[in-house]
Amino acid sequence: MIDTKVLRANFQEVKAKLIPKGEDLSDFDKFEELDEKRRELIGKVEELKGKRNEVSQQVAVLKREKKDADHIIKEMREVGEEIKKLDEELRTVETTLETILLSIPNIPHDSVPVGETEDDNIEIRKWGEAPAFSYEPKPHWDIADHLNILDFERASKVTGSRFVFYKGLGARLERALYNFMLDLHVDEYDYTEVIPPYMVNRTSMTGTGQLPKFEEDAFKIREEDYFLIPTAEVPITNMHRDEILSGENLPINYAAFSACFRSEAGSAGRDTRGLIRQHQFNKVELVKFVKPEDSYEELEKLTNQAERVLQLLELPYRVMSMCTGDLGFTAAKKYDIEVWIPSQDTYREISSCSNFEAFQARRANIRFRREAKGKPEHVHTLNGSGLAVGRTVAAILENYQQEDGSVIIPKVLRPYMGNKEVIKP
């Protein structure tokens, strides 16, 4: 949620900054009109309450003097009814304003490149060289089928499309990856490890910005107002909802492994094979709560920490700065880390690292005090994938594939896999 003080003081300027995000702003102009109506209603209610207090005092005087006060009591009741009617109107206006505020996207940071689509994203840096093959590189689903380590067909029978069974060394590779990722972030970068709930309530989904806008993308539990988490960002950020943190403890860094669940409502026909776009997948998520003045430095740190996973795995990648039109609803600035996928001859997203500034903190009411008796301020929140595990499996299978159908295990993972060096047919 953006700062209402900023919105009221700079309405047209804020609108001009939001337009390049390409989000639906159809309700945006209504805010100014309704906000003015809200102020008018508050003024009327306060005026009538003042009048009611005066009348109440007059009634008290008349009663002490044993005089007739019926006509004044009637007037007081009429004023009370008018106040009740205006209060109801005010609640309706405030509810509508709250709905509009929840639909307004975050304001892009001035450093974000202006553009409409992913074609306008800016490459920041590349790392590593794409492997050279003397043959046509195979897609990871064919490699996995040959090695008997992933089973999409049986998962489709058991559940449906966009699900998978990991088995044998495939399951062990997945487990090795998330253990390696967690060890790196916890041991080297001092993150606190968390295992979160996989279901959250509506308030939590609203706090991080998934609701109300993206409800169709979420899996909802019948007869309960619970949702399966699309990312561990949701429960981890909401750990501190409605709390005031001590500034001495910031930054707070969490690393969480979880399954993630997404309906992929708008992805029909895209990435229908393989691990790139699944309804259920595992991910290691990094979440930060920081002081406002530190958040952009922390974004660079966060991105570098996610990159380090790929560097240690020796997987080629690039870092992209997302343009305004590809920034998404909640982020003020976002980097995508994209790993090389040989069979597609392109880079694919494997991590998004975002600074939300105070956008999520306002929605979730997360604040901090610089001093024990200081005025509470909203924290800035950040999160990034460190990394999406299934996509990392896909990248390893494709980049480390051999002509005989085997796959070399990255050196850094071998201690997690019984010192095996290769996955053979």
UniProtKB/Swiss-Prot annotation:
Reactions accelerated catalytically: tRNA(Ser) + L-serine + ATP = L-seryl-tRNA(Ser) + AMP + diphosphate + H(+); tRNA(Sec) + L-serine + ATP = L-seryl-tRNA(Sec) + AMP + diphosphate + H(+)
Xref: InterPro entries: aa-tRNA-synt_IIb, aa-tRNA-synth_II, aa-tRNA-synth_II/BPL/LPL, Ser-tRNA-ligase_type_1, Ser-tRNA-synth_1_N, SerRS_1_N_sf, SerRS_core, tRNA-bd_arm
UniProt-recorded Gene Ontology molecular function terms: ATP binding; catalytic activity, acting on a protein; serine-tRNA ligase activity; transferase activity
Pathway named in the protein's UniProt entry: Aminoacyl-tRNA biosynthesis; selenocysteinyl-tRNA(Sec) biosynthesis; L-seryl-tRNA(Sec) from L-serine and tRNA(Sec): step 1/1
Protein's UniProt keywords contain Calcium: no
GO cellular component term of the entry, any: cytoplasm
Binding site for ATP: R262, S263, E264, E349, I350, S351, S352
Keywords, in A-Z order: Aminoacyl-tRNA synthetase, ATP-binding, Cytoplasm, Ligase, Nucleotide-binding, Protein biosynthesis
Protein's cellular compartments: Cytoplasm
Binding site for L-serine: T231, A232, E233, E285, S385
Entry's family note: Belongs to the class-II aminoacyl-tRNA synthetase family. Type-1 seryl-tRNA synthetase subfamily.
Protein task: Catalyzes the attachment of serine to tRNA(Ser). Is also able to aminoacylate tRNA(Sec) with serine, to form the misacylated tRNA L-seryl-tRNA(Sec), which will be further converted into selenocysteinyl-tRNA(Sec).
Subunit structure: Homodimer. The tRNA molecule binds across the dimer.
Domain remark from Swiss-Prot or TrEMBL: Consists of two distinct domains, a catalytic core and a N-terminal extension that is involved in tRNA binding.
The name this protein goes by in its record: Serine--tRNA ligase
Gene source species: Bacillus velezensis (strain DSM 23117 / BGSC 10A6 / LMG 26770 / FZB42)
